[in-house]
Amino acid sequence: MSINIKRNQLKRVVIVGGGLGGLRLAEDLCNANLQVVLIDKNNFHQFPPLIYQIASAGIDPSSISFPFRQIFRKRKNFYFRMAEARAVFPDKKILQTSIGKIEYDYLVFAAGTTTNFYGNANIEKWAIPMKTVSEAMGLRNAVLSNLERALTCATEEERQEL
Protein backbone atom coordinates (compact mmCIF):
# COMPACT_ATOMS: atom_id res chain seq x y z
CA MET A 1 0.00 0.00 0.00
CA SER A 2 0.98 3.59 -0.46
CA ILE A 3 -0.07 6.97 0.85
CA ASN A 4 -0.10 8.09 -2.81
CA ILE A 5 -0.01 11.86 -2.32
CA LYS A 6 2.27 13.78 -4.66
CA ARG A 7 4.53 16.36 -3.15
CA ASN A 8 4.11 19.88 -4.52
CA GLN A 9 5.81 23.22 -3.84
CA LEU A 10 3.66 23.88 -0.74
CA LYS A 11 4.74 23.08 2.79
CA ARG A 12 3.04 19.88 3.95
CA VAL A 13 1.27 19.64 7.30
CA VAL A 14 0.32 16.13 8.39
CA ILE A 15 -2.35 15.93 11.10
CA VAL A 16 -2.86 12.64 12.94
CA GLY A 17 -6.39 12.51 14.31
CA GLY A 18 -9.67 13.89 13.03
CA GLY A 19 -11.42 14.63 16.32
CA LEU A 20 -12.48 18.13 17.32
CA GLY A 21 -8.91 19.47 17.50
CA GLY A 22 -7.59 17.82 14.35
CA LEU A 23 -10.67 18.72 12.34
CA ARG A 24 -10.59 22.36 13.41
CA LEU A 25 -6.88 22.65 12.67
CA ALA A 26 -7.33 21.07 9.23
CA GLU A 27 -10.18 23.48 8.44
CA ASP A 28 -8.10 26.48 9.50
CA LEU A 29 -4.97 25.36 7.65
CA CYS A 30 -6.89 24.72 4.44
CA ASN A 31 -7.30 28.49 4.22
CA ALA A 32 -3.52 28.92 4.29
CA ASN A 33 -1.15 28.23 1.43
CA LEU A 34 -0.32 24.69 2.63
CA GLN A 35 -0.80 21.07 1.64
CA VAL A 36 -2.86 19.52 4.45
CA VAL A 37 -2.95 15.75 5.01
CA LEU A 38 -5.31 14.35 7.63
CA ILE A 39 -4.70 10.80 8.90
CA ASP A 40 -7.38 9.05 10.96
CA LYS A 41 -8.31 5.44 11.69
CA ASN A 42 -11.90 6.23 10.62
CA ASN A 43 -13.01 7.96 7.44
CA PHE A 44 -15.51 10.06 9.36
CA HIS A 45 -15.57 12.59 12.18
CA GLN A 46 -17.73 11.92 15.23
CA PHE A 47 -18.99 14.88 17.27
CA PRO A 48 -18.19 13.73 20.85
CA PRO A 49 -20.39 16.14 22.84
CA LEU A 50 -23.52 14.43 21.48
CA ILE A 51 -22.48 10.78 21.81
CA TYR A 52 -24.56 10.42 24.98
CA GLN A 53 -27.65 11.19 22.89
CA ILE A 54 -26.91 8.15 20.73
CA ALA A 55 -26.86 5.99 23.87
CA SER A 56 -30.15 7.44 25.10
CA ALA A 57 -31.78 6.97 21.66
CA GLY A 58 -32.23 10.74 21.41
CA ILE A 59 -30.60 11.02 17.98
CA ASP A 60 -29.43 8.79 15.15
CA PRO A 61 -25.71 7.98 14.76
CA SER A 62 -25.73 9.63 11.34
CA SER A 63 -26.59 12.93 13.04
CA ILE A 64 -23.12 13.20 14.56
CA SER A 65 -20.96 11.31 12.04
CA PHE A 66 -19.58 13.24 9.08
CA PRO A 67 -17.31 11.83 6.33
CA PHE A 68 -14.01 13.72 6.11
CA ARG A 69 -14.10 13.68 2.33
CA GLN A 70 -17.50 15.35 2.35
CA ILE A 71 -16.36 18.02 4.83
CA PHE A 72 -13.30 18.89 2.72
CA ARG A 73 -14.63 18.11 -0.77
CA LYS A 74 -14.08 21.65 -2.06
CA ARG A 75 -10.55 22.06 -0.69
CA LYS A 76 -7.81 21.79 -3.32
CA ASN A 77 -4.77 21.11 -1.16
CA PHE A 78 -6.44 18.77 1.33
CA TYR A 79 -5.90 15.01 1.40
CA PHE A 80 -7.37 12.38 3.68
CA ARG A 81 -6.01 8.90 4.31
CA MET A 82 -7.62 6.29 6.53
CA ALA A 83 -4.69 4.85 8.43
CA GLU A 84 -3.08 4.55 11.84
CA ALA A 85 0.18 6.20 12.85
CA ARG A 86 2.85 3.62 13.67
CA ALA A 87 6.17 5.45 14.05
CA VAL A 88 7.74 8.87 13.64
CA PHE A 89 11.22 9.47 12.27
CA PRO A 90 11.77 13.14 13.18
CA ASP A 91 15.30 13.33 11.77
CA LYS A 92 13.93 12.37 8.34
CA LYS A 93 10.54 14.09 8.84
CA ILE A 94 8.70 10.88 8.00
CA LEU A 95 5.56 9.40 9.55
CA GLN A 96 5.11 5.64 9.18
CA THR A 97 1.44 4.66 8.95
CA SER A 98 -0.44 1.41 8.50
CA ILE A 99 -0.60 2.13 4.74
CA GLY A 100 2.86 3.52 4.14
CA LYS A 101 5.24 6.38 4.84
CA ILE A 102 4.57 10.07 4.37
CA GLU A 103 7.00 12.97 4.46
CA TYR A 104 6.02 16.11 6.31
CA ASP A 105 7.25 19.62 6.98
CA TYR A 106 5.08 19.92 10.08
CA LEU A 107 3.53 17.07 12.06
CA VAL A 108 0.64 17.54 14.48
CA PHE A 109 -0.70 14.84 16.79
CA ALA A 110 -4.36 15.38 17.69
CA ALA A 111 -5.13 11.72 18.26
CA GLY A 112 -7.70 12.22 21.01
CA THR A 113 -8.21 10.29 24.20
CA THR A 114 -8.82 6.82 25.52
CA THR A 115 -10.96 5.77 28.45
CA ASN A 116 -9.05 5.84 31.74
CA PHE A 117 -10.14 3.16 34.18
CA TYR A 118 -7.60 4.38 36.77
CA GLY A 119 -6.11 0.91 37.11
CA ASN A 120 -9.34 -0.54 38.48
CA ALA A 121 -9.83 -3.97 36.92
CA ASN A 122 -13.50 -4.18 37.98
CA ILE A 123 -14.36 -0.88 36.33
CA GLU A 124 -12.50 -1.95 33.20
CA LYS A 125 -14.35 -5.28 33.17
CA TRP A 126 -17.87 -4.03 33.90
CA ALA A 127 -18.08 -0.40 32.78
CA ILE A 128 -19.23 0.50 29.30
CA PRO A 129 -17.10 3.30 27.83
CA MET A 130 -18.82 5.88 25.68
CA LYS A 131 -16.29 7.73 23.50
CA THR A 132 -17.43 6.45 20.10
CA VAL A 133 -20.71 5.92 18.29
CA SER A 134 -20.19 2.15 18.38
CA GLU A 135 -19.68 2.22 22.17
CA ALA A 136 -22.80 4.38 22.58
CA MET A 137 -24.77 1.96 20.39
CA GLY A 138 -23.55 -0.94 22.52
CA LEU A 139 -24.79 0.79 25.67
CA ARG A 140 -28.08 1.71 24.00
CA ASN A 141 -28.63 -1.87 22.84
CA ALA A 142 -27.80 -3.27 26.30
CA VAL A 143 -30.29 -0.94 28.01
CA LEU A 144 -33.04 -1.60 25.46
CA SER A 145 -32.42 -5.35 25.66
CA ASN A 146 -32.72 -5.29 29.46
CA LEU A 147 -35.95 -3.28 29.24
CA GLU A 148 -37.41 -5.83 26.82
CA ARG A 149 -36.29 -8.73 29.03
CA ALA A 150 -37.77 -7.02 32.10
CA LEU A 151 -41.21 -7.20 30.48
CA THR A 152 -41.04 -10.99 30.41
CA CYS A 153 -39.72 -11.59 33.93
CA ALA A 154 -41.98 -13.75 36.07
CA THR A 155 -41.01 -12.13 39.37
CA GLU A 156 -39.92 -8.76 40.71
CA GLU A 157 -36.68 -10.38 41.89
CA GLU A 158 -35.79 -11.40 38.32
CA ARG A 159 -36.55 -7.90 37.13
CA GLN A 160 -34.28 -6.38 39.78
CA GLU A 161 -31.39 -8.60 38.69
CA LEU A 162 -31.47 -7.00 35.26
Description of each model-found segment:
Residues 2-79, 160-162:
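Beta1-alpha1 glycine-rich phosphate/pyrophosphate-binding loop at the start
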Residues 1-10, 78-162:
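FAD-binding core/adjacent interface of flavoenzyme oxidoreductases
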